[in-house]
Design a protein with these regions (language model features):
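Sec-dependent N-terminal signal peptides
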Residues: 4-12
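Metallo-beta-lactamase
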Residues: 19, 23, 29-30, 122-206, ...
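Active-site metal-binding loops of divalent metal-dependent hydrolases
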Residues: 41, 64-66, 94, 116, ...
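Active-site-proximal loop/helix segments of hydrolase catalytic cores
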Residues: 201-257
Length: 341
């Protein structure tokens, strides 16, 4: 669950050697023939990265972004790489930045996900719970207020102009949230579903619980590509719905797939399965340190400040010092309680 600022920073990173087609809101990196990795240009709030998989007749889109406006912008920019219609949408999991554009596709394409995604969207009041609650309802107004203060204190016209652009995007993003109607998938599966896009096989796999209770891995066996959503990112994922021990096991199953490129829901494509092993280590270490602090009756809010996972900063440069997202540590404590029952 990432903010506009993170999207803007990622947009500024050097491009890979793959060809890139840039639209207004999204840029499409060609991974192989007919497979494009879509990331934000920074011109609007978009949410997760997306993938476009082009078949003989139509297109499969992985995840739908953080709002209907983001989904419409994606479809408009998609015209730069294909004129084929979107026939399938896959939600890798239920979090807002991967599903809040679903309503744009409803009735026009099959929206497919693990059966838990339908349950979550229909039953969990997703616009009033985490991660939407903090990432959108709290952080966006706070960001808008902070930008207004920074504009008032800006010392030069160039800085003020840049801040005003950020403010405009943040305010537009806030307004775009008002349009959201949580829309569940109309097609679900439990373990595996295979789609044939005409000469291109796409497997939808539930390898086990992890980031959430219903994570889908999109696997292209011929192209040796996986799209892992937030089950495996190239950075540290949000953990507020995690099943920690199972996550490690599920990642082990992911490593057994014959793939060469991972297209994650956030971050950048990667090829080294060693990054998955590093994240498994991060999870084990977080679980151990969290359990030790819990035994000392340290509250989750304090534990989130104390855990030290800097041993993994080489693999995950976002780690700048001790500490972890408090929502993840709260979930870790909750998860430990669940295991006692």
């Amino acid at each position: 669950m990432k903010t506009y600022l993170l999207a803007l920073l990622l947009a500024m990173l050097p491009q890979s050697s793959n060809s890139v087609i840039t639209g207004k809101a999204y840029k499409f990196e060609k991974i192989t023939d007919g497979v494009f990795y879509a990331t934000a240009t920074g011109s609007m709030v978009t949410g997760s990265n997306n993938v476009a998989i082009i078949g003989q007749r139509d297109v499969l889109v992985v995840d739908t972004g953080t709002s209907p406006a983001a989904a419409r912008a994606f479809l408009e920019d998609l015209k730069a790489i294909t004129t084929k219609p979107v026939g399938y949408v896959v939600n890798t999991h239920f979090h807002y930045d991967h599903t809040d554009g679903n309503q744009v596709y409803a009735g026009k394409a099959d929206i497919i996900a693990h059966e838990y995604v339908r349950f979550a969207i229909e039953n969990l009041n997703v616009l009033q719970r985490e991660p939407y609650k903090t990432s959108q309802l709290t952080n966006v107004p706070t960001r808008i207020d902070n930008l207004k203060k920074q504009i008032g204190n800006a010392k030069d016209a160039q800085t003020k102009s840049a801040l005003e652009q950020q403010l405009r995007i943040a305010q537009e993003g806030w307004e775009q949230l008002k349009e959201i109607t949580p829309t569940p998938p109309n097609v679900t599966y439990s373990k595996k579903k295979v789609l044939n896009l005409g000469g291109r096989e796409v497997q939808l796999l539930f390898l086990g619980r992890g980031h959430t209770n219903g994570d889908t891995v999109v696997f292209l066996p011929k192209e040796k590509i996986v799209c892992t959503g937030d089950l495996m990112e190239s950075q540290i994922a949000y953990m507020g719905d995690a099943q920690f021990a199972e996550w490690i096991t599920t990642l082990e199953a992911l490593k057994t797939l014959d793939f060469q490129t991972d297209l994650p829901g956030h971050g950048a494509p990667f090829k080294d399965k060693g990054l998955i092993t590093a994240f498994q280590g991060y999870l084990r270490d977080l679980m151990k340190q969290g359990a030790d602090l819990r035994r000392q009756s340290i509250p989750a809010e304090t534990a989130a400040q104390r855990v030290d996972l800097t041993a993994y900063k080489t693999s995950f440069p976002q780690i700048q010092g001790p500490g972890a997202d408090v929502r993840g540590v709260r979930r870790l404590y909750e998860w430990m309680d669940e295991r006692k029952k």
